A protein has these predicted regions:
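Hydrophobic alpha-helical transmembrane segments
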Residues: 53-65, 157, 161-163, 180
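Alpha-helical membrane-interface segments at transmembrane helix boundaries
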Residues: 44-52, 84-88, 92, 141, ...
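Short amphipathic alpha-helical coupling elements at transmembrane boundaries
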Residues: 23-26, 82-89, 109, 116, ...
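Non-cytosolic segments of integral membrane proteins
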Residues: 94-186, 224-277
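Hydrophobic transmembrane alpha-helix segments characteristic of membrane transport
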Residues: 58-94, 186-200
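Binding/recognition "hotspot" determinant
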Residues: 1-58
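Alpha-helical transmembrane segments and their helix-start/interface "positive-inside/aromatic belt" motifs
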Residues: 2-10, 80-100, 203-213, 268
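Alpha-helical transmembrane segments
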Residues: 191-208, 240, 271-275
Length: 278
């Protein structure tokens, strides 16, 4: 690393960005069981098991309410075709509540397979690193004391922007994991609504929303791949320009590219919901 304070400030900001981008790449390929050593997942599974008892009780309630609303009289319930239909609905709903965790993890693993396919097809094993061009390093190091004063302000502002964008981006990815945990913990309650025909739309909406959260990972990976391609062709640097103009131009274009990535990551949930019509 250079001994120049201005260069160090920019390189530290880019290091923070690269570290967070690498962390995102690692988090996206992790399952909830592996996240943070699996400690959170173990607690969520225990909560899921406790809520499952409530879900089974609600299952009976939704089933009875559904029977009362869909059948005009008790005589209809006694008809073999109606009785069979109700029995199948109840059995399927109970299976969904009992094995809800396994079903949700199966759906998550399907999306993880999609993410791996996208990565392999793009030929990316990890996120590309953003590096400060040597032309800027040389120009800044050649500046005198008074010439470097404006550069301090430019690099402070640019470094602050890059650091803030790094943390906004990583917070969005952590937010996805927290939503996965929330959906998993409370799943038996909305899944129990499948027992009644009038209430089944709640269960359908829950499954769609959970699938949307899982698919956010694929959108985030695509956004990171596109940014990595941008990073492979860094902003053009005019070696004949003044150092302040050179640094300002570089930081401006770099921050714009980063804003595009952060915006895509932040809007991943909205993009998926628009795709799925939610």
């Amino acid at each position: 690393m250079s001994d120049n304070w201005i260069v160090q400030n920019l390189e530290n900001a880019l290091k923070t960005w690269n570290d967070k981008l690498s962390e995102i790449w690692q988090l996206i390929t992790q399952s909830p069981e592996q996240f943070k050593g699996g400690t959170i997942w173990n607690v969520i599974v225990d909560i899921h098991g406790a809520v499952q008892a409530i879900g089974l009780a609600l299952l009976v309630l939704f089933f009875v309410v559904g029977v009362m609303k869909t059948c005009g009289s008790f005589a209809e319930v006694k008809k073999p075709e109606h009785a069979l239909k109700l029995f199948i609905r109840f059995a399927l709903a109970k299976g969904v509540v009992t094995y809800g965790l396994e079903l949700m993890m199966a759906l998550f693993n399907i999306v993880q397979g999609l993410i791996s396919t996208i990565m392999n097809a793009a030929g990316f094993g990890s996120a590309a690193q953003t590096v400060l061009p040597q032309e800027i390093v040389t120009a800044v190091e050649d500046c005198g004391f008074f010439e470097s004063i404006p550069l301090w302000a430019v690099t402070l502002i640019g470094g602050l922007f890059i650091t803030i964008l790094s943390f906004i981006m990583i917070m969005s990815v952590y937010g996805r994991f927290f939503r996965l945990y929330l959906y998993t913990a409370i799943a038996p309650v909305p899944l129990s609504t499948f027992a009644g025909e009038p209430s089944q739309n709640v269960g359908k909406s829950f499954i769609k929303s959970y699938a949307a959260v899982c698919l956010e990972g694929a959108i985030i990976v695509l956004a990171c791949i596109i940014f990595s391609l941008f990073a492979d062709s860094p902003p053009a640097v005019d070696p004949n320009a003044a150092p302040v103009s050179m640094v300002w131009s570089y930081i401006g274009e770099l921050v714009f590219n980063m804003l595009v990535l952060v915006g895509a990551v932040k809007m991943a949930d909205r993009v998926v919901r628009e795709m799925m019509g939610l």
